[in-house]
């Protein structure tokens, strides 16, 4: 509502030797700065208030600080009148100016009583009164005083207690300026806070003579300077004498860190921001405790429905109660446990009896010791790979290999600057929310064996757990389908099943079908009909057609079920070049296709549409034919029964093949020679220096040569595919004729048919 104006002031402005009558403003400001604050403070902030009423009170005793209409305009009351800030320094003076020009103008230092023997300074800038906003400002000031009283009553947290936030005294002392800017300064007294308390008890004379000393306020700098309060009650009642100093300076007071500590506790009410994809990796050194093979039988799985019962109850109480409601917690509020945890503990004691399981208690004790040893000692440790990781994170990686990167929304990762045992408490809090929503926490044995054994197994990162898979029984295999389905998502509520307690960190958005799809990568069908893995590989890599073990064409029999319009096309460009492992893949057998990451593609498997279709795709006429009679071999380029989309019938896009492309006689030797040529090209391209390592003036030439070799390799591969199709066609014709002969023999003599 107000607008500040800066007036530069030179050093001669405060010259005490100059005549004070020549410059009235210099006299007033200098006397003000010297009598009230003194030379010790280089910057002075003054709150001045003006009474809007023009009537004067002639009573000798005016003790009502909340009524501005009965007080003189020279006697300012900070709790009721309009305030304005005047910043006085050695270089500049800030005088607020009201934006409302419709009010009556008067000087802020001018007194309504003409009998007051005060010095009247010349008006610098007239400031209007704001009578219509008096009530609004009064409410704001009362609210501000109320907030200050609450802050005085609340106990400040010492620096030694910042360990709850993952900070100690050394970490707090090394905070960066960016963190200091992030701290909310609402706990520190703002600029509009009353620094001088008005006193009307001794300044209520009718002629205003006594207002010379009482009109200026007593400084209140308890928040900004961290001073020792002599009498807080006297300060709140504002009944002190005009010139009495209420506070004593402490020379060793650390004002900045006290304000930061109070701001961290009392102003950061929002929860910690957690990232959904934040996962702690597991370490083998931490999970060397007793596994399932060390336990006698699987009976302990029937009663281990709640593993949080074996955690320290004191840590549960303090961490959950403080992390979830920091604004309502004091120093003594962390002692009493919440009622929800007590109710949960009673329910768990009624359901579970674990006193007769010494081995289980030993296992849980070891896990607790590991968790206590894995607590972070540095706030930067959690962002790097550390040797200690929480053991309960195995569950997120124990169901499917693709579920390591998925994080359940029910279990958030631990917040930064927080101890890792507190993450256990947040997890228990999530379990309480599930109890409120109606999810029972104790699962029957036949449905909880799989999820609990996978969660407790040391090898939680490999499928369903390496140790759990090695010690699996018939019962776990029979109930694996139902247990996986019930432990994922909210399907358990729909199908009236039990939700396992240890399955809260598993992905909840996947069904059983998606799990199996993610568990085993599906083989993609290429346009040539051969099966290959989904990995990226070179289109010029060779296969095992020339290996001494013989050729297995079993995988090429899938051509009839393949899609020629597959989107998984390989790129036959100079960037990919030829495969570096060509010599190794040539000597490998087709039986190793599933374990060599797809680099065993046969060299004749050329993708016709690697760069997209060169022309229009051909459309063949489909009709019912006799399966016992083979069609005549026709070239689709010259076939009269073949049409092209978008072009007239009997037309084709592209040119006819050169050479013996239309000769369908199988020639295995020609295919062998093409394979040799591809090997030579592969070695030549791989031996070339990479373009990025060459000088700039040689790069274009080298790139051009490499593109030529790659183009020749693509053409050879296309020819190899054509030759391979000829051989395949010849073999299919022979096999078809043999089946026809057998069918005719069976039709004449059914007794020879043997199943």
Curated annotation (Swiss-Prot):
**Annotated region described as Leucine-zipper, given as residue ranges:** 709-716
Where does this protein chiefly localize?
nucleus
Identify the stretch(es) annotated as Disordered. 51-80, 99-154, 368-422, 438-483, 538-596
Q: Which PROSITE patterns match?
A: BZIP_BASIC (PS00036)
Which portions of the chain have biased composition (kind: Low complexity)?
52-80, 133-154, 368-378, 450-483, 538-547
Keyword DNA-binding applies: yes
Q: Which GO-annotated molecular functions does the record name?
A: DNA-binding transcription factor activity, RNA polymerase II-specific; protein heterodimerization activity; RNA polymerase II transcription regulatory region sequence-specific DNA binding
List where Acidic residues composition bias occurs.
554-584
| Bias (Polar residues) ranges | 385-409, 587-596
Q: Which family does it belong to?
A: Belongs to the bZIP family. CREBRF subfamily.
Function noted in UniProt: Transcriptional regulator that acts in the TORC1 signaling pathway to regulate energy homeostasis and promote survival during nutrient deprivation. Interacts with REPTOR to form a transcriptional activator complex that functions downstream of TORC1 to up-regulate the expression of most target genes induced by TORC1 inhibition. In the complex, acts as the transcriptional activator. Under normal conditions TORC1 is active, inhibiting the formation of the REPTOR/REPTOR-BP complex by phosphorylating REPTOR and mediates its cytoplasmic retention by forming a docking site for 14-3-3 proteins.
Q: What is this protein called?
A: Protein CREBRF homolog
């Amino acid at each position: 509502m107000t607008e500040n104006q800066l007036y530069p002031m030179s050093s001669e402005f405060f010259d005490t030797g100059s005549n004070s009558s020549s410059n009235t403003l210099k006299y007033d400001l200098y006397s003000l700065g010297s009598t009230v604050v003194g030379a010790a403070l280089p910057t002075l902030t003054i709150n001045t208030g003006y009474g809007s009423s023009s009537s004067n009170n002639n009573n000798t005793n005016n003790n009502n600080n909340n009524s501005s209409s009965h007080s003189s305009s020279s006697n300012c009351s900070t709790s009721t009148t309009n305030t304005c800030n005047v910043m006085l320094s050695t270089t500049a003076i800030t005088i607020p100016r009201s934006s409302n020009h419709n009010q009556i103008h008067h000087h802020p230092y001018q007194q309504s009583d003409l009998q007051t023997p005060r010095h009247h300074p010349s008006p610098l800038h007239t400031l209007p009164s704001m009578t219509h906003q008096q009530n609004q400002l009064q409410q704001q000031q009362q609210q501000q005083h109320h907030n200050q009283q609450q802050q005085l009553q609340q106990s400040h947290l010492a620096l030694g207690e910042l360990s709850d936030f993952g900070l100690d005294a050394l970490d707090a002392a090394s905070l960066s300026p960016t963190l200091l800017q992030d701290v909310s300064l609402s706990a520190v007294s703002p600029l509009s806070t009353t620094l001088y308390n008005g006193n009307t008890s001794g300044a209520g004379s009718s002629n205003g003579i006594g207002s010379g000393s009482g009109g200026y306020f007593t400084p209140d700098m308890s928040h900004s300077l961290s001073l020792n309060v002599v009498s807080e009650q006297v300060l709140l009642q504002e009944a002190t004498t005009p010139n009495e100093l209420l506070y004593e300076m402490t020379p060793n007071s650390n004002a900045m860190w006290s304000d930061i500590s109070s701001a961290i506790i009392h102003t950061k009410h929002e929860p910690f921001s957690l990232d959904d994809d934040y996962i702690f990796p597991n370490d083998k050194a931490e999970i060397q405790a007793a596994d399932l093979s060390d336990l006698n039988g699987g009976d302990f799985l029937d009663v281990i429905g709640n593993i949080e019962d074996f955690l320290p109850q004191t840590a549960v109480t303090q961490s959950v109660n403080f992390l979830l409601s920091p604004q309502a917690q004091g120093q003594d509020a962390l002692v009493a446990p919440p009622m929800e945890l007590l109710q949960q503990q009673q329910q768990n004691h009624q359901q579970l009896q674990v006193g007769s399981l010494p081995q289980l208690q030993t296992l849980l004790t070891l896990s607790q010791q590991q968790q206590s040893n894995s607590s972070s000692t540095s706030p930067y440790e959690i962002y790097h790979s550390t040797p200690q990781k929480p053991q309960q994170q195995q569950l997120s990686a124990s169901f499917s290999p693709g579920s390591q990167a998925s994080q359940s929304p029910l279990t958030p990762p631990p917040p930064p600057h927080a101890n890792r045992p507190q993450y256990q408490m947040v997890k228990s809090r999530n379990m309480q929310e599930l109890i409120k929503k109606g999810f029972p926490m104790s699962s029957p044995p036949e449905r909880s064996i799989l999820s609990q054994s996978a969660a407790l197994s040391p090898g939680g990162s490999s499928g369903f757990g390496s140790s759990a898979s090695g010690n699996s029984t018939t019962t776990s295999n029979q109930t694996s389908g139902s247990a996986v389905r019930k432990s994922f998502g909210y399907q358990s509520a729909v199908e009236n099943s039990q939700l396992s307690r240890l399955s809260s960190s598993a992905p909840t958005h996947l069904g059983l079908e998606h799990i199996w799809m993610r568990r085993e990568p599906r083989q993609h069908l290429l346009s040539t009909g051969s099966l290959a893995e989904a990995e990226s590989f070179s289109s010029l890599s060779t296969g095992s057609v020339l290996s001494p073990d013989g050729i297995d064409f079993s995988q090429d029999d899938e051509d009839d079920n393949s899609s020629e319009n597959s989107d998984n096309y390989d790129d036959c460009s100079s960037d990919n070049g030829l495969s570096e492992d060509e010599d190794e893949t040539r000597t490998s057998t087709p039986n190793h296709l599933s374990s060599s990451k797809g680099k065993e593609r046969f060299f004749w498997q050329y993708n016709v549409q690697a760069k997209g279709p060169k022309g229009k795709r051909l459309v063949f006429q489909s009709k019912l034919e006799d399966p016992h009679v083979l069609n005549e071999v026709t070239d689709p380029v010259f076939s009269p029964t073949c049409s092209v989309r978008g072009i007239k019938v009997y037309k084709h896009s592209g040119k006819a093949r050169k050479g013996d492309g239309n000769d369908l006689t199988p020639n295995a030797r020609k295919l062998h020679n093409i394979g040799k040529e591809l090997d030579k090209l592969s070695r030549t391209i791989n031996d070339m220096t990479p373009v990025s390592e060459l000088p700039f003036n040689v790069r274009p030439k080298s790139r051009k040569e490499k593109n030529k070799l790659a183009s020749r390799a693509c053409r050879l591969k296309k020819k190899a595919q054509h030759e391979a199709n000829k051989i395949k066609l010849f073999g299919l014709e022979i096999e078809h004729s043999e089946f026809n002969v057998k069918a005719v023999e069976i039709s004449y003599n059914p007794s020879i048919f043997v199943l």
